[in-house]
Amino acid sequence: MVSKASAMFSRIAPRKARMIADLVRGRDADEAIQLLSFTQKSGAPVLRKIIESAVANAQQAGADIDALFISKATVDKGPNKFNRRWRPRAMGRATRITKGVSHIVIEVDERK
């Protein structure tokens, strides 16, 4: 039984979040939570909370939480319309500072 949890518009760059998603994809859910608890990357707490939410969703649906593994972990780029600022540049110009926004989706499934 597939259970899903997502976090939209997370204020983390997609490239950094993908590194963490690649780290946990295919692992057991409890192993991934344990691994992310000790990972020093900036996106680790965000992904850990999403995995915990997906496990709780699976438990609500009646799945065996000891048999859960992360079947799918995707990180997509969100819109850059939030958190835009301007940096002064030479000759009266300005360049835009954009902060990355991510859409993170985690799916857990039971091992057969």
Swiss-Prot record:
Q: Which GO terms describe its cellular component?
A: cytosolic large ribosomal subunit
PROSITE patterns of this UniProt entry? RIBOSOMAL_L22
Task: Return the CDD domains for the record.
Answer: Ribosomal_L22 (cd00336)
Keyword terms of this UniProt record: Ribonucleoprotein, Ribosomal protein, RNA-binding, rRNA-binding
Keyword check for Secreted: no
UniProt GO MF annotations: rRNA binding; structural constituent of ribosome
Which GO BP terms apply?
translation
Which InterPro entries does the UniProt record give? Ribosomal_uL22, Ribosomal_uL22_bac/chlpt-type, Ribosomal_uL22_bac/org-type, Ribosomal_uL22_CS, Ribosomal_uL22_sf
Q: Could you tell me what this protein does?
A: This protein binds specifically to 23S rRNA; its binding is stimulated by other ribosomal proteins, e.g. L4, L17, and L20. It is important during the early stages of 50S assembly. It makes multiple contacts with different domains of the 23S rRNA in the assembled 50S subunit and ribosome. The globular domain of the protein is located near the polypeptide exit tunnel on the outside of the subunit, while an extended beta-hairpin is found that lines the wall of the exit tunnel in the center of the 70S ribosome.
For this chain, the family text in UniProt reads: Belongs to the universal ribosomal protein uL22 family.
Subunit structure comment from the entry:
Part of the 50S ribosomal subunit.
Protein name stated in the entry: Large ribosomal subunit protein uL22
Give the organism the record lists.
Answer: Sorangium cellulosum (strain So ce56) (Polyangium cellulosum (strain So ce56))
